[in-house]
Design a protein with these regions (language model features):
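Short, hydrophobic secondary-structure boundary micro-motifs
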Residues: 80-85, 107-108, 156-159, 184, ...
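GST-like domain detector, emphasizing the conserved glutathione-binding G-site
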Residues: 1-133, 147, 154
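Generic structural signal for individual residues within well-ordered alpha-helical segments
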Residues: 45, 91-94, 167, 192, ...
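GST-like fold's C-terminal all-alpha helical module
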Residues: 100-200
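Terminal-tail/helix-coil boundary detector
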Residues: 206-220
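Phosphate-coordinating loops and pocket residues in cytosolic domains that bind phosphorylated ligands
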Residues: 46, 200, 209
Length: 220
């Protein structure tokens, strides 16, 4: 099968979700690293008119939007399946993928993880404690709900790793690097155990920010 090319800034949790899915399927991929500040410029705008990431190229097929990419990968290479066969479990997977996009990232990860992890590492940002404090109520709601939906299951949509885990784990992995993680997960040992379980998978271990940054250096 033709290799996948992933256009992204190293460290993107959205791109990591794609990498995780490809690793789970044992599909070959290569990194086409983007520089910070290049998303709203050509040639990237010719791939993604909204200037976001990641963008995947597979032969002559170009695709953006992480959820669309993940579902394409799962349909293209159905073994092992990353979508539950049970309709309710599949619906729960879809629900959690959207929670990840609209609530875990928007207003939580893109604030706390940026202020604590990404901003200092990439841009030399000094964390703004007031900005972080303002988003903590939403963060608590998001963590409470994801932990509730996880319950005592091994993974987010049941007993098997799914696209929901591929999406949520990279976001949570950033959050786990912040001091807010301890308080946000204090009442949710199931969430802590789930992240440890997912991070132990070879697909997550092979796609850490540091490893992808090394790939970017080699690709430059």
């Amino acid at each position: 099968m033709t290799d996948f090319t992933i256009h992204t800034i190293p460290g993107s949790p959205f791109a990591r979700a794609v990498m995780v899915a490809l690793e789970e399927k044992a599909l070959a991929w290569r990194l086409a690293p983007l520089a910070p500040g290049s998303l709203k410029q050509q040639p990237h705008l010719s791939r993604h008119p909204f200037g976001r990431m990641p963008v995947v190229e597979h032969g002559d097929f170009t695709l953006y939007e992480t959820q669309a990419i993940l579902r394409y990968i799962d349909r293209l290479a159905p073994k092992p399946p990353l979508t539950p066969a049970d309709p309710r479990a599949a619906a729960r997977m879809d629900q959690l993928m959207n929670i990840s996009d609209w609530y875990l990232f928007q207003g939580v990860g893109n604030v706390i993880a940026f202020q604590r992890v990404v901003g200092p590492r990439v841009f030399g940002v000094i964390p703004d404690e007031a900005v972080i404090a303002a988003c903590l109520p939403k963060a608590r709601t998001v963590f409470d709900e994801i932990a509730r939906l996880l319950g005592d299951q091994a993974f987010l949509a049941g007993d098997a790793f799914s696209l929901a885990d591929a999406m949520v784990a990279p976001q949570m992995d950033f959050m786990a690097q912040t001091p807010e993680w301890t308080a946000l997960t204090a009442a949710h040992p199931n969430l802590v155990a789930w992240l440890a379980r997912t991070n132990a998978r070879p697909s997550l271990a092979a796609t850490t920010w540091d490893l992808v940054a090394e790939l970017a250096k080699k690709a430059a």
